């Protein structure tokens, strides 16, 4: 009789343990219901990039003095700077400037060390093409500013998690609680 009683007790303990595991997993599932979805519907929804995002490089031809600092600080010597020395004014004259984004590692050294700030990072990250030679941008295509994701009315913008935290902190700071 005792072995049968022990069998029922073991069965009861196993049932309670199984119910506890099911309850724990159900609680984990319920904790995920208030979270926002991780994925977005990409062509129609775009995530807002952070302030320090390193996208395509923007180049301003008129500011460049052809000093080639960007070439020297680039880990892969990527920017191609063509210039001619004007002997009458003893200055370099920039003829052509190009960057191949198929090779660029987007480190940002060229932007950081440029003495005239003619280079800047944009928020453009859609650089995919069918031909890799289209990724070689000259001074004309580098000079075009991309349309801002926020300014495009056909696309729904979605804030990422850090931007949502910043927005929540700002809204909490702006409220004042008074007791009457």
UniProtKB/Swiss-Prot annotation:
Q: Which GO terms describe its molecular function?
A: 4 iron, 4 sulfur cluster binding; iron ion binding; NADH dehydrogenase (ubiquinone) activity; quinone binding
Keywords linked to the UniProt accession: 4Fe-4S, Chloroplast, Iron, Iron-sulfur, Membrane, Metal-binding, NAD, NADP, Plastid, Plastoquinone, Quinone, Repeat, Thylakoid, Translocase
Q: Which residues form the 4Fe-4S ferredoxin-type domain?
A: 55-84, 95-124
Q: Which GO terms describe its biological process?
A: photosynthesis, light reaction
Q: Which Pfam families match?
A: Fer4_7
Q: Which residues bind [4Fe-4S] cluster 1?
A: 64, 67, 70, 114
Q: Which residues bind [4Fe-4S] cluster 2?
A: 74, 104, 107, 110
User: Which EC number(s) does the record attach to this protein?
Assistant: 7.1.1.-
Q: Which Gene3D superfamilies would you find in this protein's record?
A: 3.30.70.3270
Q: Name one GO cellular component term.
A: chloroplast thylakoid membrane
Give the UniProt subcellular location, in the record's own words.
Plastid, Chloroplast thylakoid membrane
> Which coarse location class applies to the principal site listed for this UniProt protein?
plastid
Q: Which reaction does it catalyse?
A: a plastoquinone + NADH + (n+1) H(+)(in) = a plastoquinol + NAD(+) + n H(+)(out); a plastoquinone + NADPH + (n+1) H(+)(in) = a plastoquinol + NADP(+) + n H(+)(out)
The free-text cofactor remark is:
Binds 2 [4Fe-4S] clusters per subunit.
As for membrane topology, the entry says: Peripheral membrane protein
Obligatory cofactor(s): [4Fe-4S] cluster
Enzyme class at the top of the EC tree: translocase
Q: Provide the family line.
A: Belongs to the complex I 23 kDa subunit family.
Subunit and interaction comment: NDH is composed of at least 16 different subunits, 5 of which are encoded in the nucleus.
Purpose: NDH shuttles electrons from NAD(P)H:plastoquinone, via FMN and iron-sulfur (Fe-S) centers, to quinones in the photosynthetic chain and possibly in a chloroplast respiratory chain. The immediate electron acceptor for the enzyme in this species is believed to be plastoquinone. Couples the redox reaction to proton translocation, and thus conserves the redox energy in a proton gradient.
* Family matches, as PANTHER family: NAD(P)H-QUINONE OXIDOREDUCTASE SUBUNIT I, CHLOROPLASTIC
Descriptive protein name: NAD(P)H-quinone oxidoreductase subunit I, chloroplastic
What species is given as this protein's source?
A: Illicium oligandrum (Star anise)
